[in-house]
């Protein structure tokens, strides 16, 4: 007979969802008013929230895969910047088309991630060190590619203009309601959730994160799993870079600074264990939304940026502390 999970275990399992609901309610309560209307729940503001979440959310999905195997990827913010620069330079300065530019940027990010996976899985260097070096390398490549300057993106059919089809990624909405960047994030998240539920690879991934030695002895291709996971993370960081470029109409080698920390925070708040072997993409999505709502309500109330950092830090520490208290499953 299967034992039913306790109330405490259920609360911990859905900690990110309950946390998101709590922050959402608090945001409504403490939101500034204008002519009696709650600014936080206005359509424009909620659209801004989900737009802001889309980039971090896409990166955080990839980060979830890496953390599930007990690794970390500190290079994702720099890879985002490299992808944003690449998109801008290829389309504006090199007059490449939309599809070739996007494909090259995505392939570049995937290869970059895979090489980091090779260094971790085959050479045996800790992922923290590998991706810290990767962060510097990606930033350097972005500066070389852009000449150290940001590249503005203007749209049209003439020289030095990006195709108008690229602009549509940022300007259009799905069904008149959902911004395209948010739709991209939703598709990525849903695909990742389904993938982790039904694929044999997901079982290998959790096995490596739970006990790498035991996984190797049981025939799990640990090296291939690690390389694939870092490749996925690089791919999604590049995708986020494309979304970033189209939303800001520019690519800069400084884009994405600090994004790796926000992505890790979303994963931790979502309940994924930094030790590996336990967690979910659904939790990460809730964690990213929680951070987005928190950032937005603090900005609406004109809270000092230093205080905002303090509050976000306390939220992350609280989420990590809850993981320590979580009953063993």
Residue positions per predicted region:
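Cytosolic-side transmembrane-helix boundaries in multi-pass membrane proteins
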Residues: 1-33, 190-191, 217-224, 294-329
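Single transmembrane alpha-helix segments in multi-pass membrane proteins
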Residues: 26-31, 42-94, 98, 118-125, ...
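Transmembrane helix-bundle core of multi-pass membrane transporters
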Residues: 128-198, 225-228, 249-253
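Loop-to-transmembrane alpha-helix initiation sites
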Residues: 14-16, 127, 154, 177-185, ...
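Helix-loop-helix "hairpin" substructures at the membrane interface of multi-pass membrane proteins
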Residues: 97, 101-105, 111-116, 175-251
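Helix-loop-helix hairpins and the membrane-proximal interhelical loops
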Residues: 9-54, 203, 242, 246-254
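Alpha-helical transmembrane segments within multi-pass membrane transporters and channels
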Residues: 95-136, 286-287
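Transmembrane alpha-helical segments in multi-pass inner-membrane proteins
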Residues: 231, 237, 247-313
């Amino acid at each position: 007979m299967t034992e039913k999970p306790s109330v405490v275990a259920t609360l911990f399992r859905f900690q990110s969802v309950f946390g998101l609901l709590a922050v959402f309610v608090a945001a409504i309560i403490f939101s500034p008013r204008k002519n009696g209307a709650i600014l936080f729940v206005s359509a424009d503001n909620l659209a801004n929230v989900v737009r802001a979440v889309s980039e971090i959310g896409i990166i955080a999905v990839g980060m979830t895969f890496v953390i599930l195997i007990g690794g970390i990827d500190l290079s994702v913010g720099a890879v985002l910047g490299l992808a944003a620069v690449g998109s801008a330079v290829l389309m504006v300065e090199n007059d490449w088309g939309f599809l070739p530019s996007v494909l090259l940027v995505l392939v570049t990010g995937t290869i970059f991630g895979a090489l980091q996976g090779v260094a971790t899985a085959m050479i045996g260097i800790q992922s923290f060190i590998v991706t810290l070096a990767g962060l510097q390398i990606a930033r350097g490549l972005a500066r070389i590619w852009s000449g150290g300057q940001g590249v503005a993106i203007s749209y049209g059919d003439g020289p030095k203009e990006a195709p108008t089809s690229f602009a549509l990624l940022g300007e259009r909405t799905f069904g008149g309601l959902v911004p395209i960047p948010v739709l991209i994030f939703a598709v990525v998240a849903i695909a990742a959730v389904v993938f982790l539920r039904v694929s044999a690879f997901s079982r290998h991934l959790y096995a490596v994160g739970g006990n790498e030695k035991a996984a190797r002895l049981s025939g799990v291709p640990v090296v291939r799993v690690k390389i694939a996971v870092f490749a996925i993370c690089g791919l999604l960081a590049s995708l986020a870079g494309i979304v970033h470029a189209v939303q800001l109409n520019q690519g800069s080698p400084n884009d994405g600074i600090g994004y790796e920390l926000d992505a890790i925070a979303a994963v931790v708040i979502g309940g994924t264990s930094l030790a590996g072997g336990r967690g979910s993409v659904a939790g990460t999505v809730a964690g990213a939304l929680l951070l987005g709502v928190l950032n937005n309500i603090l900005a609406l109330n004109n809270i000092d940026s230093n205080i905002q950092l303090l509050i976000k830090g306390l939220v992350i520490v609280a989420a990590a502390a809850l993981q320590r208290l979580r009953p063993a499953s």
